[in-house]
């Protein structure tokens, strides 16, 4: 079964053709450079550019896969969560294509896509622990199956990737923040600044994360530089922030490993491409799996892949399904299964 995947939940306009859930025939992505001067995503600009590009990326996905449009068996599209304007463009285009081609439609949760991404290039036996690290989400979960996912912990404020973007904006390191901070950190001293690490000891929060304190402390350091007319050392700031940001993750992960006795971990989302993080995770001495670098960030291959499995088990979505910026049928809270 050949699945056309469409992903437009934020600023990346993506389309892919995936066969039988794991054979990627094509994977096309257009990133919107227009947001760089704003040091962040401007929703109105994002949705307008999706309108301009979505037909093109779908055409390129079909051409690159060397198939005819009539060979598409299923259309999978991200319908939640994300920027509502961007989601609407993708969902409405997918609906129109579904009607025109008389092909079934399956609407997919963006987080389920990220959770599935490592399975596109790895065969991993369930159960395993999953960590999603992106600009919008920081979630630690236990996966018993592709559709049986128990949330153990989540960020209580900023997402990990969001914190990287905000620090990069304040220090004018460029956008997106993650890759730029990682690059600057290479030539920095990670112990130059002792930024705080937030760990929760209460039972109900033992797997949770927080980045607001770290973000605030890092921004306050910038004010200290200015007040003292001191030279701003972006390399040291980047290295110290990056170290603290990832140490924030380690203790909740260690707790989950101990409590569940699961020795396998998959990590996905844009932040998963960070090489410093991967070195830190190696110290856990457990089986760890990542998607290829191009599948860490938003992409349509992961949507097509999980869409195939969801369709086989649950059938097609209603053509009346609408885009949702947030989740209506469940919340990202501890103990809730997706």
Curated annotation (Swiss-Prot):
Pfam families: TsaD. Fe cation binds at residues 110, 114, 298. Substrate binds at residues 132-136, 165, 178, 274. One of its GO terms (cellular component) is cytoplasm. GO terms for molecular function: iron ion binding; N(6)-L-threonylcarbamoyladenine synthase activity. Binds 1 Fe(2+) ion per subunit. Its main location: cytoplasm. The keyword Nucleotide-binding does not apply. GO terms for biological process: tRNA threonylcarbamoyladenosine modification. It comes from Borrelia duttonii (strain Ly). The keyword Metal-binding applies. This is tRNA N6-adenosine threonylcarbamoyltransferase.
